[in-house]
Amino acid sequence: MDEAVGDLKQALPCVAEAPTVHVEVHQRSGSTAKKEDVKLNVRKLLNRHNIVFGDYTWTEFDEPFLTRNVQSVSIVDTELKVKDPQPIDLSTCTVALHVFQLNEGGPSSENLEEETENIIAANHWLLPAAEFHGLWDSLVYDAEVKSHLLDYVMTTLLFSDKNVDSNLITWNRVVLLHGPPGTGKTSLCKALAQKLTIRLSSRYRYGQLIEINSHSLFSKWFSESGKLVTRMFQMIQDLIDDKDALVFVLIDEVESLTAARNACRAGTEPSDAIRVVNAVLTQIDQIKRHSNVVILTTSNITERIDVAFVDRADIRQYVGPPSAAAIFKIYLSCLEELMKCQIIYPRQQLLTLRELEMIGFIENNVSKLSLLLSEISRKSEGLSGRVLRKLPFLAHALYIQAPTVTIEGFLQALSLAVDRQFEDRKKLSCV
């Protein structure tokens, strides 16, 4: 991370208290049971399982009430702040239950009318959304990015609750994720919005996610773009006025909205671009007064973002390509899914990277396949998370082409797919 990016850890408080264990309870869509009744029965379940080892999910229950009303009970995010899974004694922890039901409907469009055109200015989700279920867990990062982002938003709510004078201590509720394309910045923003809606379900009845289509807000008559930005944020203000809702505003590729003033002065951008920058900054200053809004932004080209916008971001987090250790976790989750679906058959146990470390990476019948996966992970360094998630599909399509395959055969195909990916890159760079 470059020097211009503040240390995320320094921006967040360290609280020395009894650990809190978060338990997410996915209530069935058709269930009409009261949340308090669901929580009561889940606590009975947890009382029978005082000791758990890291994250854990129940999907089958002995209790008929849970079978009828609950899809799953998950102990989550225990590994965000510790490197290795640890036994957890629930009787010594504060257990926070978060009961939620997923909204099955997809996104709706927010339109702005401009003369004869109807501009799709944003996509709008009601959270928690079925579309984003499981997205948080699928994102793998080396640093404590996910836990720090969660802590940041919780801190903004704490400061608002305690009526901290924002003239003395400022926070703008703006997060900027920047880094190369394909590293999962936009997905992380959506997953964070979903996670926080669930985490804060006792405080807010639902969440709203507005993904602004930055490019569509640039009118073909450039001078009108500032007005479009203002109208877009007025629509968002209507959502913020509902205090039962936690509102997330996602601006993807924010550099397209905040074209640097320097470029305007140099004559490489139209002078009307300054009006767009000013409109965005003014609207952010307007909505930051509200405690139920968080602005999430991403950028692939940090250098093009207006300095005044960067200064408004409380957290500027670099999101880079995954390391070999993170790649191993990504591949492992892909293999588990393919074994669950019986595309890889028969199922075989794979060791985690931590378990390989504990045996000193010694090769034997138990560790052989996991060591091969570790080797494939190392040679995959440099590939983005987006590409890595696609490689198992490409491996099957290009080198297997059969309904089922052994894990040995699949790992060989995956290795070939990685080699081909780098070869294709080399050819493209030569064009």
From Swiss-Prot:
The GO biological-process annotations, alphabetized, read as: double-strand break repair; meiotic recombination checkpoint signaling; mitotic spindle assembly checkpoint signaling; oogenesis; reciprocal meiotic recombination; spermatogenesis; synaptonemal complex assembly
Listed InterPro entries: AAA+_ATPase, ATPase_AAA_core, ATPase_AAA_CS, ClpA/B, P-loop_NTPase, Pch2-like
- Modified residue annotations for N-acetylmethionine: 1
Which CDD domains does the annotation name?
RecA-like_Pch2-like
Q: Please give the SMART domains that the UniProt record associates with this protein.
A: AAA
* A GO CC term attached to the entry: chromosome
Molecular-function GO term, any one: ATP binding
- Could you say which residues bind ATP here? 179-186
Taxonomically, which superkingdom?
A: Eukaryota
Q: Which UniProt keywords apply?
A: Acetylation, ATP-binding, Differentiation, Meiosis, Nucleotide-binding, Oogenesis, Spermatogenesis
Provide the family line.
Answer: Belongs to the AAA ATPase family. PCH2 subfamily.
On subunit structure and binding partners, the annotation says: Specifically interacts with the ligand binding domain of the thyroid receptor (TR). This interaction does not require the presence of thyroid hormone for its interaction. Interacts with proteasome subunit PSMA8; to participate in meiosis progression during spermatogenesis.
Function, as annotated: Plays a key role in chromosome recombination and chromosome structure development during meiosis. Required at early steps in meiotic recombination that leads to non-crossovers pathways. Also needed for efficient completion of homologous synapsis by influencing crossover distribution along the chromosomes affecting both crossovers and non-crossovers pathways. Also required for development of higher-order chromosome structures and is needed for synaptonemal-complex formation. In males, required for efficient synapsis of the sex chromosomes and for sex body formation.
Q: What is this protein called?
A: Pachytene checkpoint protein 2 homolog
Please name the source species.
Answer: Sus scrofa
